[in-house]
């Protein structure tokens, strides 16, 4: 997809599963099972982790990073993740890009399926997957992710983002703001507190 000077592509960083009832809420299983997926023996449904790659001029940025591959064997089994396929690096290769080519990442929020690919584990160390990238997240959301409620604690893995903060790579935004000319963020409350929606516009066509 092209929006003025911006070229927007979808990255495929793998599939994972979550409980179908949690995903569809008050919608009866009889309806979502027929329309989407019947669920496996544990009532889990497949979901895709698909960040966006945005390119213009000499800039290359991502919106979210997918799951990553830091999962323990136990968590990989719970979420049905094939760690050999859940890779941001492999997804970037499809566009002839390397991790060091990425200039910035706008994080809609810090749930593991959106920020997990931002870091990787080498031995006992957590290091950035994208060594030259600056990361952007809402200030209120970062505070929430550091001290989540019992309800959504399981969706935040601090190895995904705390090392970015410690290394000075994670920049917080307080409310609406333009990150690059034509690319801005708008805070929203969705399935977690203080997420941000990304707006890409050339002055005529707009993508949210």
Residue ranges and their predicted role:
Residues 73-74, 117-119, 146-150, 197-198:
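A short secondary-structure junction signal
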